[in-house]
Amino acid sequence: MPEFLERLPHAVKQKVLQISNNDAKILGVFEQVFQCGQENQDARRKAVKTGVSERLEDSELIFELRDVSFLSPIRKKLNLAITIGSDGKPALLFNKDRVPEMAIPNLQESVKFAAFLPFPEKKNLLYLFIVYRTASDEAPDPVLLTMNKEGVLKQFKDKGLIPVDSSNFGECVDYMRKQAILTGFRIGDPFSNSQGPPAFHVECHRGTKEGTLYFLPDHIIFGFKKPILVFESNEIESITYSSITRLTFNVTLITKNQEKYEFSMIDQSEFANIDEYVKRNQVKDKSMSDELKAKPMVKAHQVGEQSALKEAQQQLRENRPTGGVPIDSDDEEADGNFESESELSDGSGSDSEADSDEDADDTDDSDGTNDTHDVLQHEEIQIAAADAEDEVLPDFDQAEAGIDIVIEEDDEEEGSGVEYD
């Protein structure tokens, strides 16, 4: 039996069981309704107690906007009012039919940030976003509400706050901003401000949640599905870009507390705006940090060395110079050393042995030529291996490389004429 049923009054519980007939899907719907009610109750408990009378009187009212859709901390239509509290200080009061449901008192000290934000893809709607703190310095869920521009224009005209023939919603925004200033706080309008740094927003995902990332002059906001994230620009220590594709990329914000927040599936067309924002706010871009670059650099170095070794081996196959050194000069020098070593090792110095060597060379000239060529190839391999600094090469088949590895045994028996004890 679902846990929420145990928290219902007995009579309500019996009715739910009777209607659902223990059907899991129907019980699931009832559970969602129950949880929704709990969230609203929790939000009301978190709401700041008002300093106004139980019912709002006209004498306490400074400004009121009716039938505004609230999305946070509660979801319902309420009236937004600026009033004078019992302590004589202005307060924001959210009420239904003049009955307060929540309020933010002492606006000058409570409101930390407020701004009008565009509603993506719906030009007829506008967000009002308010971040505030309580007297105990707690940070409740921010206030988020939407305004229908046409509905607000009509209310302002009916109250005579703007000319009847006006269709400029900006006049309504200006009026509300002035009222806020008079009562101790400011409402920013960053997307209409042509003097300061430009504000912009991008669509993205955080995990499975789709939302909007707002880049404001001094804040970054992700919303508006709970939890709503608000960052002050000076709280962000660094930023990284990752998962970059032809169409999208990811952004990770790292705070000074080393908390990481990744936002994915951002359109590539927004990269220039985000990068400019990062530079303007002097945020560190750690996308090319050493720890991220280390592996690609090592891999590229290894690939480069292997390519050089393969090229040297190809040159050996084609009997071409390796590393810019002529093969002929190396062969002559090597041959000279080889002959001198042969003479020193021969203790008799008799002409008969030299004659026998010449006879052997005359009778089998082709064998001697092949042996000398094998010696050259052997020494060239040693040079290439030394230049590569003991780099491990892929295995090559001797027959494929055209190299006889057992060179010295053939030289000792046929080419040198040297006898060993």
Curated annotation (Swiss-Prot):
It is found in: Nucleus; Chromosome. It holds the Pfam family Rttp106-like_middle. It comes from the Eukaryota. Keywords: Chaperone, Chromosome, DNA-binding, Nucleus, Transcription, Transcription regulation. SMART domains: Rtt106. One of its GO terms (biological process) is transcription elongation by RNA polymerase II. Its main location: nucleus. Coiled coil: none annotated. InterPro entries: PH-like_dom_sf, RTT106/SPT16-like_middle_dom, RTT106/SSRP1_HistChap/FACT, Rtt106_N, Rtt106_PH. One of its GO terms (cellular component) is chromosome. Histones H3 and H4 chaperone involved in the nucleosome formation and heterochromatin silencing. Required for the deposition of H3K56ac-carrying H3-H4 complex onto newly-replicated DNA. Plays a role in the transcriptional regulation of the cell-cycle dependent histone genes by creating a repressive structure at the core histone gene promoter. Interacts with histones H3 and H4. Belongs to the RTT106 family. PANTHER family: FACT COMPLEX SUBUNIT SSRP1, HISTONE CHAPERONE RTT106. This is Histone chaperone RTT106. The lineage of its organism: Eukaryota, Fungi, Dikarya, Ascomycota, Saccharomycotina.
